[in-house]
Structures are given as C-alpha cells and as structure tokens.
C-alpha cells in the first residue's frame, strides 16, 4: 500500500512539474472556448490541442457539442478521424443512413466526403477530431432543425 501511495504521489508531482516546465504541454481536459454560432445550431466548445506546422501535418481539436446541437453539412480536403470520448451523437455521410456515435467509437471520414456530426438530442458529445494541414473546412449545406429532428426519430426507438 505504501508503494502505491508513493507511486501516485510521484506521478502527480511529475505531471505538475511537466506542466510548469519548458515542454509544450496542454490538456484535452480543458473545455476550450465557446465557438461562434457559425455553421451549426446549438452550443459548441472547441479546444485546439495541436496545430499543423512544418513538422506536424495534422491538427487535433477537442469538440464538445451540448445536447441538441449540430454542425452543417461539410467536407474536408483531407481524411478526418473522429474519436468519441464522451456522450452520444449522430454522424452521417451524404447518401448514407445516419448512425449513432458513442464514447469509444472511431470514425474515419475520407477526404472530400460530405458529412455532418453532432450531439444527440438527449446527450452532449465530446470527440477528438484529427484532420490534415491548413486546408479549411468546406461548408456545403445548412443542416436544418427539422432534418436533425427526423434523424433523432429514426435513431431513437
């Protein structure tokens, strides 16, 4: 038991000292900033964890969508990977049926594939989005509240 307490104390002190050092340390636990209401309905929070640069060719952003919030249809010039870390949401690619996405799910969206993703009507969702470089998101179509509500009725029985 003493060894476990010692190990825990050492681990905590190392974590604190790493955050106070010259290392580039951030936390995905931070909620981030409230996103401006552009291209989505509801409330979203973003934490830009890593930004692409000369040495790193992709971005990692933590996104939290409060319940009953959704993004518009969009696509990316690179592959996007969503790693759902909490909650339940919806995901759909153009021409395919929508699906539930839940904590633990990993979704790969191929480049230039129109899609949308959101929280569910009854739950927040938090995911890590990994996507390439500096190419901006291409917004293609507004996702209406009526369509979002129809997805809810289809997926929740």
Please state what every model-predicted region is:
Residues 90, 111-137:
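Ligand-binding loop in jelly-roll beta-barrel domains
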Residues 1-21:
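Bacterial Sec-dependent N-terminal signal peptides
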Residues 18-57, 137-157:
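A short, N-terminal "cap"/entry segment at the start of jelly-roll beta-barrel domains
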Residues 59-76:
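Conserved short histidine dyad/triad with adjacent acidic residue
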Residues 95-112:
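Short acidic-glycine-tyrosine-enriched beta hairpin
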Residues 77-90, 94-95:
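Glycine- and acidic-residue-biased ligand/ion/polar-headgroup-sensing regions
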């Amino acid at each position: 038991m003493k060894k476990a307490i010692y190990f825990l104390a050492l681990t905590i002190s190392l974590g604190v000292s790493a955050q106070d050092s010259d290392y580039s340390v951030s936390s995905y636990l931070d909620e981030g900033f409230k996103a401006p209401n552009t291209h989505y309905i509801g409330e979203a929070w973003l934490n830009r964890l890593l930004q692409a640069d000369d040495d790193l060719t992709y971005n990692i952003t933590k996104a939290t969508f409060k319940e009953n919030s959704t993004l518009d249809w969009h696509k990316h010039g690179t592959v996007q990977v969503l790693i759902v870390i909490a909650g339940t949401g919806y995901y759909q690619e153009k021409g395919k049926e929508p699906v539930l996405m839940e904590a633990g799910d990993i979704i790969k969206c191929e480049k230039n594939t129109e899609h949308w993703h959101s929280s569910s009507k009854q739950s927040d969702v938090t995911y890590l989005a990994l996507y390439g470089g500096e190419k901006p998101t291409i917004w293609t179509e507004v996702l209406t509240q009526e369509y979002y509500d129809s997805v809810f009725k289809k997926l929740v029985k």
